[in-house]
Amino acid sequence: MPFLRVDAYEGRSKEQVKNLLDAIHRAVLSAFGVPPRDRYQVYQAHADSNFIVQDTGLNIKRTRNVVFIAITSRQRTEQQKTNLYSRLVEELKACGIEQNDIVVSLVTNSDADWSFGNARAQFLTGEL
């Protein structure tokens, strides 16, 4: 049940944002094997003055198409994680986003760290 936050420069149309989020969802489905209805995504567009993208010494050139994808998820294997990075590149290429403009942060947690409402930890109670 991954939770995704996507941050990017402002300027994308509603259709472009929908296509972007759909592409990311397909990558997560493929790499993590989660059910299609497990979709929790937040998209935030930022003005130039509120978005700083610097080189970290890897000599990766960024453009205004850069997207930051922060994923909070239950523990995944290294293979699942590297598959996700590859699938994101494949899926986002159709949205005009090149691999140099995809930044991913994956944070894992445990079953006790999730509540989907009603003050319950559904992974612990067996509801999920």
Regions found by a protein language model. Give the residues of each.
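Interaction-mediating elements
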Residues: 1-128
